[in-house]
Amino acid sequence: MMAAETAAAGVASRLAAARILAAVFDQGRSLKAELTAALPGVSDPRDRALVEAICFAVLRRRPAYDVALRQWLERPLPPRDAELKALLMAGFAQLDVLQLPAHAALSATVEACRALGRPRQAGMVNAVLRRAQREGFPAVADDAGWPSWLRKQLRADWGDQAEAIFVESARMAPMWLRVPRARVSPAEYVARLAEQGITAHTDPVLADAVRLDTAVPVSQLPGFAQGDVSVQDGSAQQVADALALAPAARVLDACAAPGGKAAHLLERHPQLQLTALDVDARRLERVRQTVQRTAPDRTVRLHPADAADTAAWWDGQPFDAVLLDAPCSATGVVRRQPDVLLHRRADDIDALCALQARLLEACWRTLRPGGQLLYTTCSLLKRENQTQIEAFLQRTADAQAQPLGAQFGHAAGAGRQRFPGEQQCDGFFYALLLKAS
């Protein structure tokens, strides 16, 4: 790429990041959705990676950048300057988290200001970024980015452990991979990665897992398109360990999208009779694509349906096992979805708990006597996890809690809770229930 083209691409990357961030901050949009929509328009994989890295860095460091802007700007930027404010934060992230060469970060960000149609503000952007370069950024509390109601709830639920949650949730999560051991072992895949110059490790607990030292685009993963590897956090991979399944068991994945857990179960148990549901038909299409990539010779029954509305999808034949990966607050995956802290509201938890209870009741009806239901969330809130399960056990005479080992996390009522960063995995809750014969 010629120098002029490289410079133009650098400006376009900063501009794309600013527009994504403005949509997240000021329009309440999902970071994941905005990245999915914007990144295909960025041609170079390195520029796509830069856009993504800037966005994540800004969201993780937003409290410090907000303080810096209040201190360094003569007057606050008006709401109409949302993209300009986001661009300044994108510049901060390049100097702070990403540690890019200052001349490149400043030049491209100032030019992006002009590309925004704000040439008169280019001098201000340059001056603020140079001050950031000289002075660094204000120190803020580890919990500064968390809504006050959520800070209080986590401290009430977990005491001193909450402080570690705040710290770990601000860190970058490692990239975990899952391999189908029937085709390739984790050790063999680590060797394949090494041939590509990618350093990775197997895991002593997770039998199908590989963890990268540094994240890479999936396009760089050998055999990804052929189903030799998938991206899946270690906590999510343990779902397959928790369910003891007969070879041809009838299994329901009640909230299946995007399909990683369904695909993992099929890799482990090729003869499973798997039914996968999701209330969103577009997300269910992702399940189909995931299974088609990883297990093209397997048959899965897909239903775009609300699992709680059994009359709409269930044929009355009971399942041997049910996986209910319930909709939740996502408070255990803030390091992967930092915009959760912007968008989550206290009254969301009431609605989520009610939905989880309805799903538990409905899925339980579809389970045969002697069958198992695995309830999981990526939440850290007791109301969604151990309190939810304890209430279900109290009102459900034929439900019995089954023990899970310490490899699933800390004892939490009838289940197990992992906190973010433990075993380098995401925050996650597991509860295994047996339906009495």
Swiss-Prot record:
Cellular-component GO terms for this entry: cytosol
What Enzyme Commission number(s) appear in the record? 2.1.1.176
- What GO terms describe the biological role, i.e. biological process, of this protein? regulation of DNA-templated transcription; rRNA base methylation
Q: Which Gene3D superfamilies match?
A: NusB-like, Sun protein, domain 3, Vaccinia Virus protein VP39
Q: List the catalytic activities from the record.
A: cytidine(967) in 16S rRNA + S-adenosyl-L-methionine = 5-methylcytidine(967) in 16S rRNA + S-adenosyl-L-homocysteine + H(+)
Q: Where does S-adenosyl-L-methionine bind?
A: 255-261, 278, 306, 325
The UniProt keyword set, sorted, is:
Cytoplasm, Methyltransferase, Ribosome biogenesis, RNA-binding, rRNA processing, S-adenosyl-L-methionine, Transferase
Q: What molecular functions are annotated in GO for this chain? A: RNA binding; rRNA (cytosine-C5-)-methyltransferase activity
Q: Which InterPro entries match?
A: MeTrfase_RsmB-F_NOP2_cat, MeTrfase_RsmB-F_NOP2_dom, NusB-like_sf, NusB_RsmB_TIM44, RCMT, rRNA_ssu_MeTfrase_B, RsmB-like_ferredoxin, RsmB/NOL1/NOP2-like_CS
- Cellular compartment(s): Cytoplasm
Identify which top EC class this enzyme belongs to. transferase
**Entry's Pfam families?**
Methyltr_RsmB-F, NusB, RsmF-B_ferredox
Report the principal subcellular site. cytoplasm
Q: Where is the active site?
A: 378
What NCBIfam families does the record point to? PRK10901.1 (NF008149), rsmB (TIGR00563)
**Family named by the database record:** Belongs to the class I-like SAM-binding methyltransferase superfamily. RsmB/NOP family.
Q: Which PANTHER family match?
A: NOL1_NOP2_SUN FAMILY PROTEIN _ ANTITERMINATION NUSB DOMAIN-CONTAINING PROTEIN, NOP2 YEAST -RELATED NOL1/NOP2/FMU SUN DOMAIN-CONTAINING
Job description of the protein = Specifically methylates the cytosine at position 967 (m5C967) of 16S rRNA.
Protein name as annotated: Ribosomal RNA small subunit methyltransferase B
Q: What organism is recorded for this protein?
A: Xanthomonas campestris pv. campestris (strain ATCC 33913 / DSM 3586 / NCPPB 528 / LMG 568 / P 25)
- This chain is encoded by the gene named rsmB
